[in-house]
A protein has these predicted regions:
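Active-site-surrounding "flap" and adjacent substrate/cofactor-binding loops of secreted or lumenal enzymes
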Residues: 45-93, 106-108, 130, 140-141
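Mature, well-folded catalytic/scaffold domains that follow N-terminal targeting or propeptide regions
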Residues: 25-30, 38, 156-168, 172-180, ...
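Catalytic phosphate/nucleotide-handling subdomain of diverse soluble enzymes
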Residues: 38, 42-44, 48-73, 209-212, ...
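N-terminal leader/propeptide and maturation segments of large enzyme subunits in energy/redox metabolism
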Residues: 86-95, 100-102, 106, 112-141, ...
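Flexible propeptides and autoinhibitory/regulatory segments associated with cysteine proteases
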Residues: 2-63
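Active-site cavity-forming subdomains of large catalytic enzyme subunits
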Residues: 95-104, 108, 113-217
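Accessory "access/gating" subregions that flank catalytic or transport cores
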Residues: 6-22, 152-176, 183-193, 202-207, ...
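Acidic, carboxylate-rich catalytic segments that either coordinate divalent cations
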Residues: 3, 258, 262-296, 301, ...
Length: 424
């Protein structure tokens, strides 16, 4: 499993390195893609069904655990019609003989992995990002871009290069969720080294986000990188809490993102139900506009239902209350409200990575398709866009090879299939 476009150097086993099993990592990367797809498609059933009752669009009471397995209710743009994916709220699977479709929660990450390989680099330039977007995103609608991503793309078409495309002076949608769902994968390219992951993700995040929306994205990237460092002797819930507490350093103390983290964690540790925590998030941040979260007063479409902040707070509910159980985390995330396919995809990908392909199959007691069609939403890839999770995982290993050797000055032992990654 050598990358033919990369020169592997002689192994140097230095002191102060961490050893990561390269073969096992490939299985975990497969788990990332599979977990993200299950969670993404499950969350799409309930996406924008429930956004609260402020402004022109009112959606009634939020979902609770009682709604799982019950009829799906229409989304804010569903014209009174439930999801075409499923008449009921539940998990969405692609059977072994079918193909997973790409969506905006997986496809930009797929593009970034591809660009890192094609450009033979670990840190993409603004021009490489722009050229990649323009090559692989359809220029006409339906192009599966929204808010900040769509605005950044329009600016790229006019010749603008990141990071200018995410500057609030150019992109009024900079506070929306977009960077959170397009950049988590960078955490997996720098196992045990969130510092390097953040360096790799900095420009992709800045392509569409600034301040809180960027800090939240950095939090997710750090969580993904820290997953390789977590103590596997701990319970999954304790591993995740350790990762989250470390990733929290990405959120400045005075930011609303930091205060949201502390608030949801406090609700969780105080013994409230996840529904009570979610309802409190809605009341605190959208009704009362506390902790500096002032989006309601701006009278945005759907009261800022795509915003990075409210969806971050919602994602923390499913993170903490899911306790590392992939099924429960996806379930809570799908029922939490707002842009529910995004938090589910983020945690489905992270937990899928932590338990790997076999762990996911065991959790759901079934097997799944390993095929992925990137051309459902994007364009310009080989094999008419049909790929497999194994191939995508191998490409992820190859990206990581370059990071380990060229950026972190570690070693790759192809005989033992191990990475030797220096401690910071």
């Amino acid at each position: 499993t050598r990358n033919p476009d990369f020169e592997y150097r002689e192994v140097k086993k230095a002191t102060h390195t961490r050893v990561v099993d390269r073969q096992q990592y490939m299985d975990r990367l497969y788990g990332f893609w599979l977990g993200e797809c299950i969670a993404n498609w499950t969350g799409l059933i309930t996406e924008m069904d429930k956004i609260g009752n402020i402004g022109d669009i009112k959606t009634g009471a939020f979902y609770t655990r009682q709604n799982w397995g019950q009829p799906d209710q229409p989304s804010i743009w569903g014209q009174g019609v439930p999801s075409a994916l499923s008449p009921t709220i539940g998990y969405v699977f692609a059977a072994p003989d079918s193909t997973w479709g790409s969506d905006d929660d997986t496809d930009i990450e797929y593009i970034y992995q591809w660009l890192l390989l094609q450009n033979k680099t670990s840190v993409l330039s603004g021009t490489q990002i722009r050229d990649g977007w323009l090559s692989h995103i359809r220029h006409e609608e339906e192009n599966f871009l929204w808010v900040a991503n769509q605005r950044a793309f329009d600016l790229m078409l006019q010749g603008m290069v990141p990071p200018a495309t995410g500057d609030p002076a150019n992109n009024p949608e900079w506070e929306m969720i977009d960077a959170q769902l397009t950049t988590e994968i960078f955490g997996l390219f720098a196992p045990t080294r969130p510092d390097m992951a953040l360096k790799m993700a900095e420009l992709p995040i800045a392509t569409v986000a600034r301040n809180n929306s960027a800090w939240i994205s950095r939090f997710y990237v750090s969580m993904y990188a820290l997953a390789s460092l977590a103590d596997t002797m701990l319970q999954p819930a304790d591993q995740l809490m350790w990762m989250a507490e470390n990733a929290k350093s990405c959120l400045p103390d005075t930011s609303y993102a930091h205060k949201m983290y502390d608030f949801v964690k406090r609700m969780y540790l105080s013994g409230y139900s996840w529904e009570q925590a979610r309802d409190s998030v809605y009341d605190r941040y959208q009704v009362k506009q506390l902790d500096g979260y002032r989006l309601t007063s701006r009278k945005l479409y759907c009261n800022g239902c795509f915003a990075g902040g409210i969806n971050f707070a919602s994602s923390l509910v499913s993170l903490f209350y899911g306790k590392g159980d992939i099924k429960e985390t996806i379930k809570i995330g799908a029922l939490c409200g707002w842009d529910s396919d995004n938090p589910t995809a983020t945690w489905g990908g992270l937990l899928g990575f932590m338990i790997g392909k076999k762990g996911i199959e065991k959790a759901f007691n079934r097997t799944f398709s390993e095929k992925y069609n990137i051309h459902r939403t994007r364009t310009g890839f080989p094999n008419n866009g049909i790929d497999t999770f194994w191939n995508m995982a191998l490409h992820g290993v190859w990206v990581t090879d370059r990071v380990v050797q060229d950026e972190l000055h570690g070693s790759i032992d192809l005989q033992e299939n191990k990475w030797y990654i220096p401690v910071e």
